[in-house]
Amino acid sequence: MQLLKVYIQETVMRLTTELVPLFFLTYVAHILQIHGLGVQVGTYALVMLTISVVATAIRIYAQNELSKMPPNKRGNSSFFWGVWAVQAVILIMLALGTWGLINGANLPYTGIFKLQLLFYVGAILDISWLYNGINKTRIVVRRDALLQMLRFVPLIILVKSPSDLSRFIVLLAVTTIVANLLLWLRLPSVLVPVSVTTSNVKFHIKAMLVFLAASLLPQLSLYLNKAVVFVTQGVEDVAVYYSAELLVKVGVALVLGIAMAMMTKVTQQKQIGNSAGIAKSFYDAIEYSSALSILIAVGVATVGPQAVYWFLGTSFAKTGDILQVLAFVIVVASWRYSLSLQQMAAERGFRNISASVQVGAGVNVVLTVFLVPKFGVLAAAWAALIGELVALILQVILLSRVVDVWQLVRVSWRYIVAGVVALLGILAVIRSVPGPYPKFSALEAVVGIVIYTIVVYFFSTPVVTTTNIVVMLALKRMYNSLIEFTRVVLRIDK
């Protein structure tokens, strides 16, 4: 039950920031249509190429240093102002350089590009790394949730036609700025006034160079695919790729909660010095993530292409082809996250835990640059999948002294079989129904879930055993609550 509680907490936090944009997507896709959405996504991706690398490097550096510092407000304050000064100066210089490039290069959609520069203001004001570093993460989580809520009503009021693209971009940027400003309002409770010397600033700049190099490839892989698709294939292709990617991110967020929850088991085993228990936690993480990720991936790959027609519109039909490739990223990423997060919790002497991420991101970037211009938007999806596969393989190699590859296969093959059977069942339904309508998409999803569940129960896996225990405990509590409610209403003494 404790694992279930942690999973729900972790998943809810992530889905808040993933599901709301998904709801926005269906509205924006119908209002701005495929061209408007493509222009927004493409220009945003190009602007974020520089912002994301710098902001991520600063965030990782600051959080890492703050977590090692003693809980002293004066020390934290001196560190904060020194790092933020570096953040502000670098991002202002990048913003000015980007402004000059936009004006001098005679780019298409110049007006839209200039509006996207407002995100530099949001990045300059983003101090979430301070709260994460001093273990006040809930403040950042609330900020992220509030950010999505701030956008909801204004979106419906202000964005009503394809001509409202500029309003949409300003809305996204301004709400980001407002949400980040709210973090500044809490500074008096965590910092005190201090003086900042130039020596502190110079020290931070030198220390950040390593983190800048470490964040380069992973951040490029997040935005370069959409940027290259936008430049070489056009606005419509980048819109359909972004739509597919957003749907897949929701699937990954659902599974990532399992990996986060399983970290508590690794920590407990480490505290009692149980090496065998730590190794078993790796296998358990893979098993539980497989059980959920394979089901979600099968649904995304089969039901997703049908649902796209009514969820986004017929102009987004190409999104279905991309989903059939990106869906498998859900499974591969869930395995990689499960292994890497358990590795971090175990602290078994692996210093270069980012090696797999760096190599996988590098493969993704290289494939994107060379394949997308020639083979189109589907190549971007394959580049993402291959990059994740390379990262997973390298992660397994790094853990070869701790985990057995064949044991990983043994704990996951039954869910793969269940996924294949569910896939065949869903395809049979798709061929039987008259078309891609919401009621038929719901039917396909239900059929897939039922078939998958039956096959998994047939194998009597550990996930089934755990599920039975949780269900029986839940039913017992419901029964006891009903008895107690009846006793109180009827005034029956115990």
Regions found by a protein language model. Name each.
Residues V54-P71, A244, V248-S290, L339-A346:
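Helix-loop junctions and terminal segments of transmembrane helices
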Residues A85-L217, L222-Y223, A428:
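Hydrophobic transmembrane helix module of multi-pass membrane transport proteins
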Residues L101-Q116, A301-V331:
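Interfacial segments at transmembrane-helix termini and the short loops linking adjacent helices
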Residues L427-K494:
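Membrane-proximal transmembrane or re-entrant/amphipathic helices at the cytosolic face
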